[in-house]
From Swiss-Prot:
Motif window: DXD motif: 211-213
GO process annotations (BP): GPI anchor biosynthetic process
Protein name: GPI-N-acetylgalactosamine transferase PGAP4
Name of encoding gene: PGAP4
Similarity-based family: Belongs to the PGAP4 family.
Sequence ranges on the Cytoplasmic membrane side: 1-22, 281-287
Alphabetized PANTHER family for the sequence: POST-GPI ATTACHMENT TO PROTEINS FACTOR 4, TRANSMEMBRANE PROTEIN 246
Organism: Pongo abelii
Predominant place of localization: Golgi
Length: 403
């Protein structure tokens, strides 16, 4: 007489037959240990990781960041107070270049007192230009002050060292009192003014528009030299409207839908999957090659890279300027934007045709123009500037946070 066996009982029998040496058991244990123990322990303080413990660390890290920014602001202030002014001996990088190859235009407003954001930005550019030497002789610093008030102390201080364009100099402007003009439209018009002033004053080959809370990374000039001299000679890059030098780290995950990122993510699995499979087969003394094991390690590596944070793996590209990637741009944000001169003139025309408002800032306006005008734009990865401004010039923020 035969007896029927339930599916649950059959499953239990099969599980009992599995030994610790079973491939399935080993890979299951590896998954649990990696994603349940090792990665959370190693990454719980990484700000842009899915393992980041926000409730434990965010407030403290935000306060530490603000305190460090205050110290760096004070250091930048002392730096300029001790630097010889235009009445004395001015370093060559501050002197006007007849027709520069690259104009670095820093747009500034009077921000939260004490942090001296614009001083931090300009002092870092000055230091990097000095280190760059003859290679950067065709670079020109240019400050564009769009603060309506005359009380912008940092801009006044910098005017001793850097050529300055003041949008509201010598005028009693009631621009902000016009009910039809909101802060987002004013920011766009300020941007247009600074871009146009850069072109009219210097007629350069390129204009780098930098907001006053975007500190350049150490590698910015070697990377720009490589990109503009070599990579942007390629036909599909040559006529780009702009090149973004910054994209928020929180938006750099693979799960933020960008076609090129998906291809990169699959490429990570295709690269690391076979490598980890070979390592596993070698150390586990498994004969031959297993497609299921390779599929597991491909998915394992893709999941690990995404959960730890794509941002941190992008940092490996800083080893060489040639490793930086250039991919199609998305809409956010504008801390640092590079315009070839012909594209800058097209941008001025385009921006004069749009009106910005809440929910449609200048970054979205620029991005919307790509499809409307048949233009292309790109972003370089990893970022070439650090965004240090936790206090927005558009929105009141009494409790600034890193996220």
């Amino acid at each position: 007489m035969s007896t029927s066996t339930s599916p649950a009982a059959m499953l239990l029998r099969r599980l009992r037959r599995l030994s610790w040496g079973s491939t399935a058991v080993q890979l299951f244990i590896l998954t649990v240990v990696t994603f349940g123990l090792l990665a959370p322990l190693a990454c719980h303080r990484l700000l842009h990781s899915y393992f980041y413990l926000r409730h434990w660390h965010l407030n403290q890290m935000s306060q530490e960041f603000l305190q460090q920014s205050l110290k760096e602001g004070e250091a930048a202030l002392h730096y300029f107070e001790e630097l010889p002014s235009a009445n004395g001996s001015v370093p060559i990088v501050w002197q006007a270049t007849p027709r520069p190859w690259l104009v670095i235009t820093i747009i500034t407003v009077d921000r939260q007192p004490g942090f001296h954001y614009v001083l931090q930005v300009v002092s870092q550019f000055h230091r990097l230009l000095q280190q760059c030497g003859p290679q950067c002789e065709g670079h020109q610093l240019f400050l564009c002050n769009v603060e309506r008030s005359v009380s912008h102390f940092d801009a006044k201080l910098l005017s001793k060292y850097v050529p300055v364009a003041n949008r509201y100099e010598g005028t009693e402007d009631d621009y902000g009192d016009d009910p039809s003009t909101n802060s987002f439209e004013k920011e766009k018009q300020d941007y247009v003014y600074c871009l146009e002033s850069s072109l009219q004053t210097y007629n350069p080959d390129y204009v780098l528009m930098v907001e006053d809370d975007a500190v350049p990374e150490e590698q910015i000039f070697p990377v720009l030299e490589h990109l503009l001299r070599a990579r942007f000679s390629e036909p599909h890059l040559r006529d780009a409207l702009y090149l973004k030098l910054y994209h928020p780290e929180r938006l750099q995950h693979y799960t933020n839908p960008e076609p090129m990122r998906i291809l990169e993510w699959v490429g990570v699995g295709m690269l690391l999957g076979p490598l980890l499979t070979w390592i596993y087969m070698r150390f586990a003394s498994r004969p031959g090659f297993s497609w299921p094991v390779m599929l597991f390690f491909s998915l394992y590596s893709m999941g690990l890279v995404e959960l730890v944070g794509r941002h941190y793996f992008l940092e490996l590209r800083r080893l060489s300027p040639s490793l930086y990637s250039v991919v199609p741009a998305s809409q956010c944000c504008t801390p640092a934007m590079l315009f070839p001169a012909p594209a800058a003139r097209r941008t001025l025309t385009y921006l004069s045709q749009v009106y910005c408002h809440k929910g449609f800032g200048k970054d979205m306006a620029l991005y919307s123009l790509l499809r409307a005008k048949g233009e292309r734009a790109y972003v370089v990865e990893p970022n070439l500037v650090k965004h240090i401004g936790l206090f927005s010039s558009l929105r009141y923020n009494f409790h600034p946070s890193l996220l």
